Amino acid sequence: MSENSINVVNVSKKFRLYHEKRTSIFEALSGNINQKSYYETLQVLKNISFNVKKGETFGIVGRNGSGKSTLLRILSRIYQPDTGTIETTGSVVPLLALGLGFHPDLTAITNIYQSSILLGISKKQIVEKTDDIIKFAELEKFADTKLKNFSSGMAMRLAFACAVQVDPAVLLLDEVVAVGDMNFQKKCKLVMKDFKKRGKSIV
């Protein structure tokens, strides 16, 4: 495990897809309506195995509905696999939905504190990094503004800044994240390159 940041061995995941039984016209007219539901089992992932080395950028590709997002959520510990094992080295920060966990009625500063605590960051570290997060997100004039007054681009920049300032061992991205304008995207790419140089993994 020393050379790898992630080890995935024979991971499988199923979900239940529930359906409501259709009511016939006769049942509807007679008032004899019984709400019956049934489900089918969807095999989303089956016996998935791979390793991600430290400092490696690892891409997961596939068709829509092939289980890419489910796999990332398992790596994030949001879902548990039905079978198989996952081992990770160091902190893992998921950026699966930009702004996930943010509250629209809280200010940018308060959301930084809340998000960082959820990511396991100490209060001391949060205080030290808050200014850097605001500066990286280019939101100096909006630190005390509630998120409900942010544009989607502003919220995205804040979420990305929170994730990278945590400095995780593994950063999980759901699809290619286009955050902000061209200048901000260039800044994000430089961060990714620096991550890789310092032995961080990106999935």
Where are these regions (language model features)?
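Pre-NBD coupling/linker segments of ABC/ABC-like ATPases
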Residues: S2-N47
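Helix-to-loop junction immediately C-terminal to a conserved catalytic motif
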Residues: S76
